Amino acid sequence: MILITDKKGFYITTPIYYVNDKPHIGHAYTTLATDIIARWHRINGENVFFLTGTDEHGEKIAKAALAKGKNSQEFVDEIVKEYKDAWNDLNISYDYFIRTTDKAHMDVVQ
């Protein structure tokens, strides 16, 4: 979890989760803790930006996709849906869900 605060606002992020498998209780714990902190700062009148998301590159993902008989993008799209559904079920108040396969993300990091 990263916390950055200044007079303009408060920025907080979860780890960018690696999506070689479905979300588990550890992901939920970290995201819920981050959400609680974001909500506390909002209640106190701060302009909060809460980021979460997924890291969708790497050999583990390629192997997991292959084991399921899918290409990597199809596989991560399905897993990301599970993350988003879980955060919705937990009423997580994130402002932006970043994916490392998003064009905007790839443009920035190149």
Task: Identify the meaning behind each predicted range.
Residues 1-110:
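N-terminal, positively charged nucleic-acid-binding surface of large information/translation enzymes
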